[in-house]
A protein has these predicted regions:
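Intrinsically disordered, low-complexity protein-interaction/activation regions
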Residues: 2-3, 7, 13-14, 20-33, ...
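TPR-adjacent "capping" and linker segments in tetratricopeptide-repeat scaffold/adaptor proteins
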Residues: 19-34, 95-106, 171, 175
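Residue-level recognition of tetratricopeptide repeat
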Residues: 32, 63-68, 104, 137-141, ...
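Inter-helical turn/loop elements of alpha-helical hairpins
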Residues: 34, 39-56, 60-64, 69-106, ...
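TPR repeat positional signature
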Residues: 36, 69, 76, 108, ...
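Alpha-helical repeat scaffolds
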Residues: 54-57, 85-99, 122-132, 155-169, ...
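Internal metal/ion-chelating core segments
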Residues: 161-262
Length: 274
């Protein structure tokens, strides 16, 4: 079907393997759609702004974009609230009925999210690992696994899941910096503070808008009781992490913890009032 105006012509082809910029297969043949999806994916990895409205707008125009529905489900499933399970299931059902042939990677992501919805968190971790074993540059699967590990307090996998994938990555691959940001947090949660800080700072230099990487470095500094360094870390980079409706609010809270330790209560109240 050929759409007019700004709507892109596309087909779902079973005989051609379509790839994203990291070489991960996508079942949708429509470059403009996939480019817009990549923008939402980067938003997800940065933890700065909520990517769901952007992908919902995309899905209004292209309701047969199965990966977009899976992405929406992953975003919602990255939290632990049970009340959102019906919304997650709705997105998964939309992906399955989108009209095209899902690939193995997409079916694997659906299986992982479904296990999470059923309360089988360990099974969900395993399902994500199976996707990553086949597609080690799938950052949507990596994000999902990272959040599962975080919610379960699984420090070993927070670090190890990413270490298993690093041989497949280098700095030329899109979203490499976000992999480093996740790795930094896993290292910090494993008490490997010096390595975590170095990796987290590198991630922030590669993508200054990576709020999760800022958060990882902030955790290191807090764990080491370096309160003045924490104030400098967040204060000197405020333009990079402080905006948005995602993790920036949590990073403000971390900054206030440092300020509380040095008894700068006036600044804390200024932040609260703003």
């Amino acid at each position: 079907m050929l759409n007019t105006g700004t709507v892109e012509a596309r087909t779902v082809r079973k005989d051609t393997l379509m790839m994203d910029p990291r070489g991960v297969p996508v079942s949708y043949d429509g470059q403009m759609v996939r480019d817009r999806y990549e923008t939402s994916l980067t938003m997800l990895h940065r933890f700065g702004y909520d990517p769901v409205p952007a992908v919902e707008e995309l899905l209004e125009e292209y309701p047969d974009f199965a990966l977009g529905h899976i992405f929406r489900a992953v975003c919602i499933a990255s939290g632990s609230a049970a009340r959102y399970i019906p919304e997650i299931e709705r997105s998964l059902a939309s992906a399955e009925s989108a009209g095209g042939a899902l690939n193995d990677r997409e079916r694997g992501l659906i299986a992982a999210v479904r296990k999470r919805c059923c309360g089988d968190w360990r099974g969900a971790q395993t399902a994500v690992e199976q996707v990553l074993a086949a597609f080690p540059r799938d950052t949507l699967a990596l994000h999902l696994g990272h959040q599962f590990d975080f919610l379960l307090g699984d420090a070993l996998n927070l670090r190890g899941r990413i270490e298993r994938l690093l041989p497949h990555w280098d700095s030329s691959i899109p979203n490499y910096s976000h992999v480093l940001g996740m790795y930094a947090f896993g290292l910090e949660e494993s008490n490997l503070f010096d390595h975590a800080e170095a990796v987290g700072r590198e991630a922030c230099e590669r993508d200054p808008a990576d709020t999760w990487a800022h958060h990882a470095v902030g955790h290191v500094i807090e764990m080491q009781g370096r309160h003045e360094d924490g104030i400098i870390w967040y204060g000197s980079r405020e333009a990079d992490w402080a905006t948005g409706d995602g993790l920036s609010i949590h990073n403000w809270w971390h900054l206030c913890l440092y300020l509380m330790e040095v008894e700068d209560y006036g600044r804390i109240l200024e932040i609260y009032d703003s």
